[in-house]
Swiss-Prot record:
Keywords: Aminopeptidase, Cytoplasm, Hydrolase, Manganese, Metal-binding, Protease
Organism superkingdom: Bacteria
Protein name: Probable cytosol aminopeptidase
NCBIfam families in the record: PRK00913.1-2 (NF002073), PRK00913.1-4 (NF002074), PRK00913.3-5 (NF002083)
Any Pfam family matching the protein: Peptidase_M17_N
């Protein structure tokens, strides 16, 4: 798939960087073969240097390359990893759409003082996967697609180091696509049982320990919160645990907890039709955790990790749980149910407690939890909450490295008072619509207790209704790369 070479050969296409107000030595060398015509195109603004612009130039036999794709990156001083990701992803999409199977990239043309060749190689391989991802459909009339099968990386840097960076980037991109495919699956095809089977296959592939708790075992452990959500369903619930041992001693364990609600009708607090369509994606947190575990399994960081996925659907029937019910969670805390559509936090409550039972010293939960976070932060920023600023800073640094933006929301004492306000139980699961995202996160904090914890609400970032820089409409695979990067950096400390 990737080859590292020092010189150009015969290629269907070559990708070259263009910065504003600067003609690089790479462009100057090409311009000699074009007898000054490239500089003329630049002077006439027919080769664009604007961010994310792509200009195609046919060689017309002047070189052994058929066509060149010049990628505009804007001003060099404003050049970022986010610009690089978006620009290269768009380029790979373009090559795929134009049915080019063999391409090369002048890697060093994208290198600056801020971004070295290792960074560029990692990002190029990552967005090679992300940008060319195709939505998996079930149409009987399937179109034949031509894929971009080969990318040759031209660089003067050390080949082994570049190959290693390409491998890591590719693993990150491929695992993100795995998560996308899971989230896009129809709910009749991805039940809690099927999700558990997927997780077990992943664990066995990468030699991880695993446990899948059945309903009877959950009852023995007192997982009343997850079981309450499952009451209305004919599909059995699953509590999934994947255990990766990256150190000889079982300590400093990171617990990744992903919400695995395979379909959410809202239960008796029923969603309207428009609010229900798309709820197959309510297991986006579970997919993010499984994607991260795929990366961890491939790259083998020296860090202990537990992945926990509480999984069920949330449907209506004569046996479904109801507003006014009082349930007992695995932690022993009782919960007054005021809203059955606030079910994700109930499942996660038992997931967090189970992660602690298995030895997690740090907790990061990921969930498509609230519409409130979309109102607050929109569809491009993940909401975050924490009880430990040190852990949050580590998550934030990982997210900045992957360009998956997060923003911290507060937890004040009055927020805790609101989730503890119940005449009948220790907690209530839905204090009201105002501050909805904060209330949900604060509720989860009651189960994290003193264990360092970060909550990531991906309700706005888990999917998109239109094509975007890094892929097609549908699931984004958000937080896969951030979680994996967090674990990788923990393992390096």
């Amino acid at each position: 798939m990737f080859q590292v070479q020092t010189e150009l050969a015969n290629h269907g296409a070559v990708i070259v960087a263009l910065f504003e107000e600067e003609t690089s030595r790479f462009v100057q060398e090409l311009d000699k073969a074009f007898e000054g015509q490239l500089q003329g195109l630049l002077d006439e603004k027919e080769l664009s240097t604007k961010k994310k612009s792509i200009s195609k130039v046919h060689s017309l036999g002047k070189t052994n390359v058929k066509r060149y794709y010049f990628v505009g990156l804007g001003k060099k001083e404003a050049y970022t990893t986010e610009t690089l990701r978006a620009s290269l992803s768009k380029t790979f999409k373009t090559l795929q759409a134009e049915k080019i199977q063999d391409a090369a990239i002048l890697l060093d043309s994208f290198v600056t003082e801020k971004l070295d060749a290792i960074d560029v190689a990692h990002i190029a391989a990552e967005v090679y996967c992300l940008g060319t991802y195709r939505l998996q459909t079930y149409k009987t009339d399937k179109k034949e697609h031509v894929e971009l099968e080969k990318l040759v990386v031209i660089t003067a840097e050390d080949a082994k180091e570049i190959e290693a960076a390409l491998t890591v980037g590719y693993v990150h991109g491929r695992a993100t696509n795995s998560a996308r495919t899971l989230v896009n699956m129809p709910p009749n095809m991805l039940t809690a049982t099927k999700l558990a089977e997927y997780a077990v296959e992943l664990a066995e592939k990468y030699d991880m320990d695993y446990k899948v708790l059945e309903k009877e075992e959950m009852e023995e452990l007192g997982m009343g919160a997850l079981l309450a959500v499952n009451q209305g369903s004919t599909e059995p619930p699953k509590m999934i645990a994947l255990i990766y041992k990256g150190k000889e001693e079982w300590k400093d364990v990171i617990g990744l907890i992903g919400k695995g609600i395979t379909y959410d009708t809202g239960g008796y607090s029923l969603k309207p039709r428009d609010g229900m369509v798309g709820m197959k994606g309510d297991m986006g947190g579970a997919a993010a955790v499984l994607g991260a575990m795929e990366i961890i399994g491939e790259l083998r960081p020296e860090q202990n990790v537990i992945a926990i996925i509480p999984s069920t659907d949330n449907v209506v029937s004569g046996t479904a749980f109801k507003p006014d019910d009082v349930i007992t969670s695995m932690s022993g805390k009782t919960i007054e149910v005021l809203n059955t559509d606030a079910e994700g936090r109930l499942a996660l409550a038992d997931g967090i407690t189970y992660a602690k039972k298995l030895g997690a010293n740090y907790l990061v939960d990921v969930a498509t939890l609230t519409g409130g976070v979309i109102v607050a932060l929109g569809n491009h920023t993940t909401g975050a909450m924490t009880n430990n600023e040190t852990l949050f800073e580590q998550v934030l640094e990982a997210s900045m490295e992957t360009d998956e933006r997060i923003w911290q929301l507060p937890i004040f004492e009055r927020d805790k008072e609101r989730v503890r306000n119940s005449k009948f139980a220790d907690l209530n699961n839905s204090p009201g619509r105002d501050g909805h995202a904060v209330m949900a996160g604060t509720f989860l904090g009651e189960f994290a207790e003193d264990t360092p914890w970060v909550h990531l609400d991906i309700a706005g970032t888990s999917d998109t209704t239109s094509t975007h820089d890094l892929g097609p409409a549908g699931a984004t695979g958000v937080m896969v790369r951030t979680l994996a990067t967090l674990v990788e950096r923990f393992g390096e400390e």
